[in-house]
Regions:
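Structural preference for solvent-exposed beta-strand-turn elements
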Residues: 1-195
């Protein structure tokens, strides 16, 4: 088959899909605002987050994080803030070798983590030179609690752009997080709103 192409001036705009990092945060904020979630997404990491959010919405007892560190580090504190004690988060052996970098009340069992207590309001101290995903996970989970909390960095933050991406997603969904000299203060309980 032969096709002829003729020169033409093209106009319009193309919406580029968000990055994987932005999608994780957007999905979580949509979930917390009570918005519908997409049916499916391309990419194993964001698909793991989408599946995990469905488990949280529908009341399942386990979340498979696959190989996604972001899914584990974002959904673990979120599930704790939602009071999902007993929930089991699993993943690939390689994922589960990586540290959580936060003192969460979880039990290590059956190739994963089981939540033993809910997340409570308070002061959380984290190292800023480890993964920013732990910081972002807490920034998205702490607004769900009934009282204010504080997130303090004990070392300088190395991945500020990812934390800024989280703060931007929260702002777009109606949640204000206050920046302090050493971290953030999270007033509670704000209400997540549709973007």
């Amino acid at each position: 088959m032969t096709r002829r192409l003729y020169p033409a001036r093209l106009t319009g705009t193309v919406a580029a899909p968000p990055s994987k990092s932005a999608w994780h945060r957007e999905l979580i904020c949509r979930f917390l605002a009570g918005q519908p979630l997409p049916q499916e997404l391309s990419g194993a990491d964001v698909s793991a987050t989408l599946s995990g959010l469905r488990v949280l919405r529908q009341g399942g007892d386990a979340i498979d994080c696959g190989a996604s560190g972001a899914t584990l580090r974002f959904l673990l504190p979120l599930a704790m803030a939602l009071g999902r004690t007993g929930l089991h988060l699993t993943g690939t052996p390689r994922l589960l070798e990586r540290p959580l970098s936060a003192p969460y009340p979880v039990a290590r069992e059956n190739a994963g983590y089981r939540i033993t207590e809910p997340l409570t309001p308070g002061r959380y101290a984290l190292r800023g030179d480890e993964t920013s995903q732990t910081v972002s996970g807490l920034l998205m989970a702490l607004p769900l609690l009934a009282e204010p909390s504080e997130l303090v960095l004990t070392t300088p933050l190395v991945s500020r752009a990812y934390v800024d991406m989280t703060l931007d997603a929260l702002r777009r969904h109606g949640v204000t997080v206050l920046t302090t000299e050493t971290g953030w203060r999270i007033p509670a309980p704000p209400v997540f709103q549709p973007d």
